[in-house]
């Protein structure tokens, strides 16, 4: 008899956390572990005690025609990774040496269903992960395979290159005139 891997087990839990998301465009769920125990969870949602997009009945970014991946400050929601880190801080939980698992889905414009996509933290979340002391990030993918990153590799890359050279975060190299 075989069992699913621990990474798949935790990514499945992150998927369930994502189902609490209150974003019309996407659902993301994050869990953070220390010593093989879940210490925090987070999903895409509005700040505590404020109305989310579902309650308001609209997406502010859609109304302003803001493309996906841009102008995050014009979104009512906080990202799943950020919420998981914030929830740990609120509970006084130390994240040093922890592992973050992230599951992501995007709404399909044709079917209205949410399809699993390759998860990857935005650049702001990546910086928060680094500063929180999390050591490892495990990302879900549409293929069902997980991708594992050592946060120390991100730091090393940013030490030898500029932050704008982070092709995985940006999808392309920014062309900055000096």
Which positions does each model-derived feature cover?
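Short glycine/serine- and small hydrophobic-enriched flexible loop segments
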Residues: 16-19, 34-37, 86-90
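Short, basic/aromatic recognition patches
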Residues: 2-27
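Zn2+-dependent cytidine deaminase-like catalytic core
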Residues: 4-5, 12, 40-178
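Short beta-strand scaffold segments in enzyme catalytic cores
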Residues: 27-42
